[in-house]
Amino acid sequence: MTDLKKAAQRAIELMDLTTLNDDDTDQKVIDLCHKAKTPAGNTAAICIYPRFIPIARKTLDEIGAEDIQIATVTNFPHGNDDIAIAVLETRAAVAYGADEVDVVFPYRALMEGNETVGFELVKACKEACGEVLLKVIIESGVLADPALIRRASELSIDAGADFIKTSTGKVPVNATLEAAEIMLTVISEKNTQVGFKPAGGVRDAAQAAEFLGVAERILGADWVSPRTFRFGASSLLNSLLHTLELADAPKPTQGY
């Protein structure tokens, strides 16, 4: 197997296959569940809006893919600074049956100099999660400044995040190698049990390999696993399957 094919295979096993569109329906989520059970093995998770968790759970059970985790989003996509609402949404997501919650850090508040609300919001949402995995989206493409990307990562980890994630996929700049370098460095300094999720903008096996390479350089080859590394993506899967010669070439897309 070539290095590119190895990267494609790994990326599928590390993927949160995502649909977070305004026009999502039960049928689209059912289709997503079927896609997540790929000819190259199952993706790590699917990521969907909370209201679709019950139909996703039912579908995954029906197709014998119970090992695929169900992730959802809260305080999404704008990262508002109302802690009470973020906590209510997170509790509701857990009640719906989410295995993982991706919450948006109040990044605009941080840009305005308020570090406290981000820390407190993540801490409160982690408490609301209990045993459910908490990923914190810092929206690195909007933060832009390396010092802010670093600070959002530090605050999230200090507040109890299980993962730090680059992006919502709803802004012009999503996952970049520069942001990955900063965020993974913070993980190496703070707590190597914390995971990393580049989301949006990873289009093919070659790009996936670049992100995996940064993680391995900073944290070691043994660090990368579904417990510590995920790709948030929708259009990436078809490209990876094409690399593995298991699907036709993907059509050009503007998607996540």
From Swiss-Prot:
Molecular function via GO: deoxyribose-phosphate aldolase activity
Subcellular location field: Cytoplasm
Top-level taxon of the source organism: Bacteria
Keyword check for Zinc: no
Active site per database record: 102 (proton donor/acceptor), 165 (schiff-base intermediate with acetaldehyde), 197 (proton donor/acceptor)
Enzyme Commission number(s) from the entry: 4.1.2.4
Catalytic activity as recorded in UniProt: 2-deoxy-D-ribose 5-phosphate = D-glyceraldehyde 3-phosphate + acetaldehyde
UniProt protein name: Deoxyribose-phosphate aldolase
Species, as recorded: Shewanella sp. (strain W3-18-1)
Gene designation per UniProt: deoC
